[in-house]
């Protein structure tokens, strides 16, 4: 007789969301979407939350919901982004106006201050992936050079002291997303390609930090770096209080992406994100300089 394979029904991993900062701008939507799935009988293994606004996770209504989920057996895993560019003037545009690439994001210092509380909410620093993402370099409207690379090195040092082990980075370069190229042309700011010498420097410095601090720094979808998994089913299994299994299937939704299966609840088209990062490939609400 032919063998029959039994389909395993794993609990799901929910991603909220790669496409928009739901905790900051759409917390009620986030709560509703999770509750709807639970009411429909879906079992949630882990809720992976992505945000540049860690303080939003401590908003009373959202916090109460997250604590309830955690107490019900849903693992909380946080992807926290700190690039060093939050609400920071990093140069000038073509009209000589101060340029903030992340105009409505919190400062690096604000985010670092709140991290111990997020670690407490997660239950362990291993349930946080710190994203120094992206790294960019530009010549601004005054032809002055800027990169946030050194800020990212400093961020890893500071976060490692809190016990955070996993880090992700990407590189913003011209020619990857037409929307991003168009935005920077509008601003009169030149995105610069990362030449091989700079890439080699990044690799060397990150390797040195890994050895010094005992951390792991992974590239997110960058040619020439090993494939990595921002959502890593095996890690989520190992970190889950009950060690329950989850799908390890890799959909490969983007080239060089090693993420395992998850359901992203950000919706399509993506929700408008008022954080307004100039390098965003999704649907940012760009900052207007008319009132500056």
Where would I find each of the regions flagged by the language model?
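Flexible loop/turn segments at secondary-structure boundaries
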Residues: 56, 225-227, 287
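A C-terminal junction/extension of Radical SAM enzymes
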Residues: 196-258
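Structural recognition of alpha->loop->beta junctions
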Residues: 125, 149-169, 233-261
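Local cysteine-cluster metal-coordination motifs and their immediate loop/turn environment
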Residues: 263-264, 268-285
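Acidic carboxylate-rich catalytic motifs and surrounding loops in phosphoryl-/glycosyl-chemistry enzymes
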Residues: 132, 169-173, 215-229, 269, ...
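Short, compositionally biased "basic patch" segments
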Residues: 1-7
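Conserved AdoMet/S-adenosylmethionine-binding subsite of the radical SAM
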Residues: 7-191
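Short cysteine/histidine-rich zinc-coordinating motifs and their immediately flanking basic loops
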Residues: 285-292
């Amino acid at each position: 007789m032919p063998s029959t394979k039994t389909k395993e029904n794993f609990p799901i991993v929910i991603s909220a969301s790669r496409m928009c900062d739901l905790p900051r701008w759409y917390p009620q939507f986030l709560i509703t979407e999770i509750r709807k799935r639970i009411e429909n009988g879906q079992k949630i293994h882990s809720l992976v939350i992505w945000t540049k606004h860690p303080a939003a996770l401590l908003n009373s209504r959202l916090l109460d919901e997250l604590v309830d989920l955690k107490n019900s057996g849903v693992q909380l895993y946080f992807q926290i982004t700190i690039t060093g560019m939050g609400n920071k003037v990093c140069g000038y545009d073509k009209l000589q106006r101060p340029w903030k690439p992340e105009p409505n994001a919190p400062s690096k210092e604000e985010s670092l201050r709140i991290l111990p509380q997020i670690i407490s909410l997660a239950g362990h620093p291993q349930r946080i992936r710190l994203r120094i993402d992206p790294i960019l370099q530009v010549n601004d409207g005054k032809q002055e050079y800027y990169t946030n690379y050194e800020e990212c090195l400093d961020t890893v040092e500071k976060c490692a002291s809190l016990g955070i082990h996993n880090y992700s980075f990407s590189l913003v370069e011209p020619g990857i997303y037409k929307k991003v190229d168009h935005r920077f042309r509008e601003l009169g700011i030149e995105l610069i390609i990362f030449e091989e010498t700079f890439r080699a420097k990044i690799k060397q410095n990150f390797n040195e930090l890994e050895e010094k601090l005992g951390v792991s720094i992974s590239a997110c979808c960058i040619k020439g770096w090993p494939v990595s998994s921002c959502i890593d089913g095996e890690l989520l299994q190992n970190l889950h209080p009950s060690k329950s299994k989850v799908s390890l299937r890799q959909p490969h939704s983007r080239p060089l992406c090693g993420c395992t299966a998850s359901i992203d609840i950000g919706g399509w088209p993506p929700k408008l994100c008022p954080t307004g990062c100039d390098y965003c490939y999704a649907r940012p609400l760009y900052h207007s300089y008319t009132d500056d």
